[in-house]
């Protein structure tokens, strides 16, 4: 049997709309992500389990893990009879790369089970294609970090889909999911079709400056440049309490605060444990809306998707 864990990810990381993504894992060892197991069988089957299993579609063929199996078999030109099991530990529509977790874990598990017939870039291309079926368009800012780990910059040139950007080992990423759902498609539809020239210039400056600060290891400068002029001004209205949380992050001493992907999860970057804990406590008391919500203090997950057991 093969079992793969795929971690949560932050799409956009504020400053890089559709071109930056970061994988994260809780510092307490909690597996914040999905697991998919594959074992030999006479015919294909798919079993679902996990905390958020009730959110999955009733029709097995609408399950993205089934579609991963189907697309993988098509790619290698062979039907592989297997029993698959999805542990859905990630809330759907959370802004934590939930669909990416299932896609990455599903495709990597099949590839490992079949002794890796597909190379990493081919597999990553399939991951983007499958995730795009859910989000409505192909973009790699969740699947790339989820699969490869770390902070990934999307390139899509010279045979590379993405490459890793050096980040800051001391940073703690406080992740808060309030327990409500925001559709990625809805969150994309709310964005304007065109942007002002000044916004385009600011976006380019922030993104270029952030990448430069990462490569030259200037954490304060990098955090200062984590500003979103593309999505956050429009998506804030979809996120009850986000404006208050952003103000609290500033008061508490977080280096940066932003929307994770399409939301409603937010992240706050801190450079010491005490500040991160104060931020986590505030978010637990003020940002969570029901018992499905949660807060985790995380670090960058540099390993990405990996075999378990």
From Swiss-Prot:
Annotated localization: Cytoplasm
What does it catalyze?
A: L-homoserine + ATP = O-phospho-L-homoserine + ADP + H(+)
Annotated InterPro entries: GHMP_kinase_C_dom, GHMP_kinase_C_sf, GHMP_kinase_N_dom, GHMP_knse_ATP-bd_CS, Homoserine_kinase, Ribosomal_Su5_D2-typ_SF, Ribsml_uS5_D2-typ_fold_subgr
User: What are this entry's molecular-function GO terms?
Assistant: ATP binding; homoserine kinase activity
Question: Which terms does the UniProt entry file under GO BP?
Answer: threonine biosynthetic process
Q: What is its EC number?
A: 2.7.1.39
Q: What EC class does the entry list?
A: transferase
For this UniProt record, give its keywords in alphabetical order, as a comma-separated list: Amino-acid biosynthesis, ATP-binding, Cytoplasm, Kinase, Nucleotide-binding, Threonine biosynthesis, Transferase
Supply the SUPFAM superfamilies for this chain: GHMP Kinase, C-terminal domain, Ribosomal protein S5 domain 2-like
Gene Ontology annotations for the cellular component aspect, listed alphabetically: cytoplasm
Instruction: Give the function comment from the record.
Output: Catalyzes the ATP-dependent phosphorylation of L-homoserine to L-homoserine phosphate.
Q: Which family does it belong to?
A: Belongs to the GHMP kinase family. Homoserine kinase subfamily.
The molecule here is called Homoserine kinase
Which species is this record about?
Serratia proteamaculans (strain 568)
Gene field: thrB
């Amino acid at each position: 049997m093969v079992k793969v864990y795929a971690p949560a990810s932050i799409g956009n990381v504020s400053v890089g709309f559709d071109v930056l993504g970061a994988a994260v894992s809780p510092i307490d060892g909690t597996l914040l992500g999905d697991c998919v197991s594959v074992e030999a069988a006479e015919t294909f089957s798919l079993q679902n389990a996990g905390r958020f299993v009730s959110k999955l579609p009733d029709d097995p063929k609408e399950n993205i893990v089934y579609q991963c199996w189907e697309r993988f078999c098509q790619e290698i030109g062979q039907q592989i009879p297997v029993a698959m099991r999805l542990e859905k530990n990630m809330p759907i529509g959370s802004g934590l790369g939930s669909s990416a977790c299932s896609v990455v874990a599903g495709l990597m598990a099949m590839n490992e089970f079949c002794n890796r017939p597909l190379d990493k870039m081919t597999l990553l291309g399939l991951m983007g294609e499958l995730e795009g079926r859910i989000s409505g368009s192909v973009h790699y800012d969740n699947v790339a970090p989820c699969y490869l780990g770390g902070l990934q910059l999307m390139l899509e040139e010279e045979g590379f889909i993405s490459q890793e950007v050096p980040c800051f080992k001391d940073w703690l990423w406080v992740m808060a999911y309030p327990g409500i759902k925001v559709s990625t498609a809805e969150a994309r539809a709310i964005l304007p079709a065109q942007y002002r020239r000044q916004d385009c210039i600011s976006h380019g400056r922030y993104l270029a400056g952030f990448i430069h600060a990462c490569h030259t290891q200037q954490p304060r400068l990098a955090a200062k440049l984590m500003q979103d002029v593309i999505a956050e001004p429009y998506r804030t209205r979809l996120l009850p309490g986000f404006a208050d949380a952003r103000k609290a992050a500033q008061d508490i001493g977080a280096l940066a605060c932003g929307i994770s992907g399409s939301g409603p999860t937010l992240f706050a970057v801190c450079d010491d444990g005490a500040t991160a804990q104060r931020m986590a406590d505030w978010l637990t008391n003020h940002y969570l809306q029901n018992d499905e919500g949660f807060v985790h203090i995380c670090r960058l997950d540099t390993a990405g998707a990996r075999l378990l057991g």
